[in-house]
């Protein structure tokens, strides 16, 4: 059966329990929001195919449990991830403070070239805000990571967050492919051309006695 996509990108949502990872996933994959979601047990995933630069990208998005008891299970999924979103709740100071711990987990378990993004979720609840947008931006700048505030409930910046991460992965992938093609061309130039084999001409002489 022919593939219906050009590339498959594996994305991961990590962060403390209750920050809204599952809600973000459902908003992006199904454009739905449900206030009765229970905490993810272990790990779950959704799929959505998007088009970027004329290519169909299948996004396989994994939603991880934030509870400590599932940490061993969830870190096993870091290795194959091409993009990781670290999510905190703007109404929960502790979830923001723990972003640094989640970043350390990524450094320990994920690929060194994984694309990363920090999301400050629940920005629709501004009246209960404990973490300013400026603090979120500063943290992201300190680690050289992109940052967005999102709201799964109000559908604010959810689409933009996932598409931005996918586009960053695509850009890095294209760069690697171009570098590989360039290296192959350089290697060919370095290799000395093969000389065509020449058959030795055998000359025969006739001796005649006069």
Swiss-Prot record:
Species: Diplobatis ommata
Localization in the cell: Cell membrane
InterPro entries reported for this sequence: P-loop_NTPase, Small_GTP-bd, Small_GTPase, Small_GTPase_Rab
Protein name: Ras-related protein Rab-8
GO cellular component, one term: plasma membrane
UniProt-listed SUPFAM superfamilies: P-loop containing nucleoside triphosphate hydrolases (SSF52540)
Family: Belongs to the small GTPase superfamily. Rab family.
Chain positions recorded as GTP binding sites: 15-22, 63-67, 121-124
Position of sequence motif Effector region: 37-45
Protein's membrane topology: Lipid-anchor
Lipid attachment, kind S-geranylgeranyl cysteine: 207
Residues annotated with Cysteine methyl ester modification: 207
Transmembrane segments: none
Molecular function in Gene Ontology: GTP binding; GTPase activity
Pfam family, one: Ras
Key words, A-Z: Cell membrane, GTP-binding, Lipoprotein, Membrane, Methylation, Nucleotide-binding, Prenylation
